[in-house]
Amino acid sequence: MKANHIRILLLVTIAIMFISLMGKWEQTFPADNTKQQTSATQNNSHYDNADSSTNTDVTTTDAKSSLAKETNFSKYDNAKSITINTGVFKDVKVSLLDGAIISASLKDYSISLDDKTPMSLLTDKSGSEYIAKSTIVVNKQPISVNFEDQGIKIENGKQILTLTGSADGLQITRTYTFDDTKYNISVSQNIKNTTSAPVNVIVDDSFARDFDPAGDSFSLLNAHSYTFTGVAYSTAKDSFRKESFKDISKTNGQPTVINSDGQGWVAFLQHYFVSAWIPQSTNAKIYYKNLNGDVFEAGAFTGATIAPNQSENISSILYTGPIIKANLVDLAPNLEKTLDYGMLSFFSEIIFWVMNHIHSLVGNWGLAIILVTCLIKLIFYPLSAKSYRSMAKMRMLQPRIKRLQETYKDDRQALGKKMMELYKEEKVNPLSGCLPMLIQIPIFISLYWVLLESVELRQAPFIFWIHDLSMKDPYFVLPVLMGLSMFLQQKLSPAPADPMQAKVMMFLPVIFTFLFASFPSGLVLYWLTNNLISISQQWIITRHYQATHKK
């Protein structure tokens, strides 16, 4: 295959690879539960396997009708609530009905560039409800608790809200501890059995969300549609698994229960943000399910048998906030994996680490992208220089190649043989021009996921009209400049021998301009910067080579 054929294939492969394959892999290839579900059994409630003696890894149940009533969002409408504000949270509302957290806004993250209102990660807004709750279950039946507010006290700089309530012979004291600078909330409860008989109690920490999976569709020209929305969890056997809401909606209401076999966690994931329950016990079980229609629930429940006049302490940590590795790594094992950069995460993490350090110095993510690009080009300069010298030599051979083409225009086999002899004689590798492009593929894909998944770049401005590097260029200036740079780069490269190939190559900048028009502007900025540096390097090396090899 000719060198120009290879170049064309590589260019097209880049687009197809990260758009059609990498871009969609999270939605197309969700976690496969086949291996675990070999031990699945059918039951009438996801609490049926709550005993600590149960060893089932995964249990699917068929209790849709009985579970649908567990989350009735409207029941919180008329209940009183306590509002708490911290350095990172605005208007955290804790309902006195069951102690559910029905609203929490993030002070440092606005809804959009145009709407600076803090975004509500948890919300009781009708039609888009998303709440965190801790349900008391007695003898495998959820009970409702009307709590009383015992006030908020400040201790070591932390706000501690205490609620007390009683139901079905249980006295419950629940505390919520808020750290002023953190997104994690400690939820602890003391449950006392005031009856004359032992009571089997379960504390079910869960999320419930009204979400339409049909609206979470993939679009080739919308980069943000590649992101994941659904459930994630971690156990001793599975360090990190995900299940999209779209896939869960196809389970016909059958909850899936997983034995954590140690400290695990369960979370609702969305673009840039995560809400996670982290039980502090080692015998918790994790579950997720589609309650009915567009309502999804996931949680972790811990069981205990409380003797008469005895009490049990059960604690959990609730995290609801941005997906920032530094915030998550110490909360629970593998929680930082919710920052999922895909198959090339190793390279992505290195790129982000370097970018983050540069950003701390220059204070602008756009400049950080440019400087990272310069650094990458510097590291790979020896390979690029070798490739450009080979291309310069190929360019100088063009007159001889054209003479061969004219001489053997009716004998393509002989032409191919003579050209290979020429390459061998002049010690030229016609494929070496592809090397810089091959090097760019993993870097390009890695940076793509960094720009798409890193919340630090959400609404990050660059200059002038670029107000958000994670979104497309609103005026398409960068994609057009990138297309022009590709066209200029082609002019510096050896011309294709085949006229048809030359026409195809001429249209590639147009095709890529169209594709890049929908990509995050930060990614286009990287590609444009990379092209401009490559053009400069190639021009200098070509001029120098031609000056020193004139005959």
Swiss-Prot record:
<feature type="compositionally biased region" description="Polar residues">
    <location>
        <begin position="33"/>
        <end position="47"/>
    </location>
</feature>
<dbReference type="InterPro" id="IPR001708">
    <property type="entry name" value="YidC/ALB3/OXA1/COX18"/>
</dbReference>
<keyword id="KW-0812">Transmembrane</keyword>
<dbReference type="GO" id="GO:0015031">
    <property type="term" value="P:protein transport"/>
</dbReference>
<dbReference type="InterPro" id="IPR028053">
    <property type="entry name" value="Membr_insert_YidC_N"/>
</dbReference>
<comment type="function">
    <text>Required for the insertion and/or proper folding and/or complex formation of integral membrane proteins into the membrane. Involved in integration of membrane proteins that insert both dependently and independently of the Sec translocase complex, as well as at least some lipoproteins. Aids folding of multispanning membrane proteins.</text>
</comment>
<keyword id="KW-0813">Transport</keyword>
<keyword id="KW-1003">Cell membrane</keyword>
<comment type="subunit">
    <text>Interacts with the Sec translocase complex via SecD. Specifically interacts with transmembrane segments of nascent integral membrane proteins during membrane integration.</text>
</comment>
<feature type="region of interest" description="Disordered">
    <location>
        <begin position="33"/>
        <end position="59"/>
    </location>
</feature>
<dbReference type="Pfam" id="PF14849">
    <property type="entry name" value="YidC_periplas"/>
</dbReference>
<comment type="similarity">
    <text>Belongs to the OXA1/ALB3/YidC family. Type 1 subfamily.</text>
</comment>
<keyword id="KW-0997">Cell inner membrane</keyword>
<dbReference type="Pfam" id="PF02096">
    <property type="entry name" value="60KD_IMP"/>
</dbReference>
<keyword id="KW-0143">Chaperone</keyword>
<feature type="transmembrane region" description="Helical">
    <location>
        <begin position="431"/>
        <end position="451"/>
    </location>
</feature>
<dbReference type="InterPro" id="IPR047196">
    <property type="entry name" value="YidC_ALB_C"/>
</dbReference>
<dbReference type="InterPro" id="IPR038221">
    <property type="entry name" value="YidC_periplasmic_sf"/>
</dbReference>
<keyword id="KW-1133">Transmembrane helix</keyword>
<dbReference type="InterPro" id="IPR019998">
    <property type="entry name" value="Membr_insert_YidC"/>
</dbReference>
<dbReference type="GO" id="GO:0051205">
    <property type="term" value="P:protein insertion into membrane"/>
</dbReference>
<feature type="transmembrane region" description="Helical">
    <location>
        <begin position="3"/>
        <end position="23"/>
    </location>
</feature>
<protein>
    <recommendedName>
        <fullName>Membrane protein insertase YidC</fullName>
    </recommendedName>
</protein>
<dbReference type="GO" id="GO:0032977">
    <property type="term" value="F:membrane insertase activity"/>
</dbReference>
<feature type="transmembrane region" description="Helical">
    <location>
        <begin position="504"/>
        <end position="524"/>
    </location>
</feature>
<feature type="compositionally biased region" description="Low complexity">
    <location>
        <begin position="50"/>
        <end position="59"/>
    </location>
</feature>
<keyword id="KW-0653">Protein transport</keyword>
<feature type="transmembrane region" description="Helical">
    <location>
        <begin position="361"/>
        <end position="381"/>
    </location>
</feature>
<keyword id="KW-0472">Membrane</keyword>
<dbReference type="InterPro" id="IPR028055">
    <property type="entry name" value="YidC/Oxa/ALB_C"/>
</dbReference>
<dbReference type="GO" id="GO:0005886">
    <property type="term" value="C:plasma membrane"/>
</dbReference>
